[in-house]
């Protein structure tokens, strides 16, 4: 299979190449809505429904308007019902948004009661984005193998990033050069992720890098285009949407031509009598070793899980975070020198940095958390599907099948929770230094990584990747917008999801003093 058949070349194309098709589908959806309004999942929970234009607004219009006005609806609901619960209606179903007063009660409930994987599947249009939800193998591998190994993995991460900085950035010793930051960060993260997740066999193979990056882009393009559609249209849209069709081709290519052969060869060597063979020390091998049954150990499913976890939990989220961070620095350049000073003081030699060195970057850690607070991945978090009828301690009844969540965005900008919430204070969490003030910390007032036993397990690894990239970038480059920007590039809103503008170019120039 020719990889170029499903290559998406630029971020601008990533978000806009199918706009014409989306517009036509949108018109079609509106027409069909009035004829056949059947959301995939509805709920009869007895809580107020919050609508964009008020309670008089017909439900059908509320569903149609949600994708373009989700923040207004969610913030309005939180303002009115932040100590109880409310419902929002989307094109494909209903969400019950619960107050954080339920957090302690819900956070440790088992997956047999509240299922996070099923909620992720629903929220990410899993039937059309190839998301697997039949096992916790990838989560278990992160928790048992990846996170405890971060300290010894950092030298490998540095080695790969050192190579990546040399090959991914243009020559710019004497003059500024233009780059698309999202594209560059995407490739940096993909490279370091590949080194840890699949080892030396494929990590620098362009065919793997491009396939995994394009797979990532197609997942989120498919989500962005399908979420505005009512659920009953998904089977039709999924068949004709180029990004959705490409995902299946990409997955098959990776299973059959890239990872599948690697898995089979590793198993052949394991079964051989070769006493010299030593198992690779990477995420793929850890999953192979932890797999408990035939389904988990099948090469196709191992390939699928590894691709999914790298694409969704490592590459996309880290590249998006890095792009947000860069825009914050470009619009608040007075923060650059304090960050550089801290890097100089705590990391004497970037190429020999340790986990302890990176953990001492408390100003950077606070800055990352503040950037995420004001530019989160979405306004809703703690998504769960209720697997059996559930009555909460105050009597609120949640029937089986209810999709619940919490308003992470409004919570992190609530003046009762955060002082002066509309101000970007890079030192906010340095001054707090509480148990939940760290970038990767979670709690009822800080849920952008989730909450409880199913909070994002890869956040620890991702945080060190981001700190390594940012520390090297800050010390090696000066940077500015390509044109005279006075404001931060506006985020793109896709329903309740928030992404940076990925089409804004910047100029970079190599500094005389490097990491």
UniProtKB/Swiss-Prot annotation:
Locate the transmembrane regions by residue number.
20-36
How is it placed in the membrane, per its record? Single-pass membrane protein
One Pfam family this chain carries? p450
Q: GO terms for CC?
A: membrane
> Highest taxon of the source?
Eukaryota
Ordered alphabetically, the record's keywords are: Heme, Iron, Membrane, Metal-binding, Oxidoreductase, Transmembrane, Transmembrane helix
Its GO biological process annotations read: paxilline biosynthetic process
What lineage does the source organism belong to? Eukaryota, Fungi, Dikarya, Ascomycota, Pezizomycotina
PANTHER family for this protein: CYTOCHROME P450, P450, PUTATIVE (EUROFUNG)-RELATED
Name one molecular function that GO assigns to this entry: monooxygenase activity
Q: What happens when the gene is disrupted?
A: Impairs the production of paxillines. Leads to the accumulation of the paspaline intermediate.
Q: What does this protein do?
A: Cytochrome P450 monooxygenase; part of the ATM2 gene cluster that mediates the biosynthesis of paxilline, a mycotoxin that acts as an inhibitor of mammalian maxi-K channels. PaxG, the geranylgeranyl diphosphate (GGPP) synthase is proposed to catalyze the first step in paxilline biosynthesis. Condensation of indole-3-glycerol phosphate with GGPP by paxC then forms 3-geranylgeranylindole (3-GGI), followed by epoxidation and cyclization of this intermediate (by paxM and paxB) to form paspaline.
Catalytic activity, EC: 1.-.-.-
Location comes to: Membrane
Per its UniProt record, the required cofactor names are:
heme
| Principal location class | membrane
Q: Which organism is it from?
A: Penicillium paxilli
Name this polypeptide is given: Cytochrome P450 monooxygenase paxP
* Pathway(s) where this gene product acts: Secondary metabolite biosynthesis
UniProt: heme binding residues: 456
């Amino acid at each position: 299979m020719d990889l170029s058949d499903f290559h998406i070349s630029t971020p601008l194309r990533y978000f806009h190449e199918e706009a014409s098709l989306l517009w036509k589908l949108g018109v079609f959806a509106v027409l069909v809505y009035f004829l056949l309004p059947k959301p995939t999942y509805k709920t009869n929970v007895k809580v107020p429904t919050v609508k964009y234009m008020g309670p008089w607004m017909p439900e059908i219009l509320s569903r149609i308007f949600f994708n373009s006005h989700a923040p207004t609806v969610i913030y309005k609901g939180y303002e009115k019902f932040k100590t109880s619960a409310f419902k929002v209606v989307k094109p494909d179903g209903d969400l019950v948004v619960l107050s954080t007063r339920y957090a302690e009660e819900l956070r440790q409930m088992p997956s047999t009661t509240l299922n996070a994987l099923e909620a992720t599947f629903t929220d990410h249009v899993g039937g059309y984005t190839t998301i697997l939800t039949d096992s916790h193998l990838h989560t278990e591998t992160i928790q048992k193998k990846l996170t405890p190994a971060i300290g010894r993995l950092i030298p490998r991460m540095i080695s790969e990033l050192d190579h990546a900085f040399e090959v991914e950035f243009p020559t710019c010793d004497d003059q500024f050069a233009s780059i698309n930051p999202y594209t560059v960060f995407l490739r940096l993260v993909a490279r370091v992720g590949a080194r840890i997740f699949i080892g030396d066999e494929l990590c620098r193979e362009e065919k793997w890098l491009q396939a995994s990056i394009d797979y990532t882009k197609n997942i989120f393009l498919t989500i962005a285009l399908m979420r505005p559609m009512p659920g009953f249209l998904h089977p039709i849209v999924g068949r004709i949407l180029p990004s959705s069709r490409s995902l299946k081709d990409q997955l098959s290519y990776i299973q059959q031509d890239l990872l599948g052969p690697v898995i089979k060869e590793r198993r052949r060597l394991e079964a051989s009598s070769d006493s010299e063979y030593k198992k690779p020390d990477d995420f793929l091998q850890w999953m192979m070793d932890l797999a408990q049954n035939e389904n988990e150990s099948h090469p196709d499913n191992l390939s699928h899980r590894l691709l999914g976890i790298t694409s969704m939990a490592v590459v996309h989220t880290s590249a998006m975070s890095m792009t947000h961070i860069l825009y914050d620095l470009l619009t608040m350049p007075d923060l650059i020198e304090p960050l550089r000073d801290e890097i100089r003081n705590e990391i004497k030699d970037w190429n020999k940095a340790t986990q302890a060195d990176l953990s001492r970057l408390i100003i950077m850690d606070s800055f990352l958390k503040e950037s995420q607070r004001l530019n989160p991945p979405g306004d809703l978090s703690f998504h769960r599907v209720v697997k059996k009828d559930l009555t909460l301690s105050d009597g609120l009844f949640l029937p089986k099948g209810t999709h619940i969540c919490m308003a992470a965005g409004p919570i992190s900008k609530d003046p009762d929770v955060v002082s002066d919430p509309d101000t970007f204070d890079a030192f906010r969490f340095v001054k707090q230094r509480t148990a939940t003030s760290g970038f990767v910390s979670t709690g009822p007032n800080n849920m952008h990584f989730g909450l409880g036993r199913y909070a994002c397990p890869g956040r620890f690894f991702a945080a060190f990747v981001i700190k390594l990239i940012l520390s090297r970038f800050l010390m090696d480059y000066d940077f500015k917008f390509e044109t005279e920007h006075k404001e931060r590039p506006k985020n793109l809103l896709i329903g309740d999801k928030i992404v940076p503008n990925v089409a804004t170019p910047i100029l970079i120039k190599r500094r005389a003093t490097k990491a």
